[in-house]
Amino acid sequence: MNEKIDTVIIGAGHAGLTMSYFLSERGLEHVIVERGRVGERWISERWDSFHFQFPNWTIELPGYKYQTEDPDGFVPGGEIVRFIQEYADSIKAPVRSGVNVTALESSSNSTRYLVRTNVGAIEASDVVIATGQRERGIIPPFSCVV
């Protein structure tokens, strides 16, 4: 038997956590599946000396602003990771780390989707793909009828 939930968010970065925030505010059941850890791309795909490319005063997620004594400075990548992880904790985001999505299919009931993962399948009414701006998308064949 597949787990059933209203919404599955794929990816626990800025976009996925922001979606989680707004779904939670509306009392909508959801889960975030993340192949690595919260903010994984900031952890594993940036060089050690990387700094955020926008001034500190611009760093904000819904209901959560980056606190700094230098609003015009540029925060190091490690601080961004901490900020994202603290945000996930503060909004009590329902993140499942270490869950790799292997397929997304329309389920036998055409109004739902089946998210296949390395730890089982989740049936959902809605799926939000928040895997990052440089992710190579694979568009499922059924998407033309959605």
Each PLM stretch: what is its role?
Residues 43-82:
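Glycine-rich active-site loop/strand segments that organize a redox cofactor
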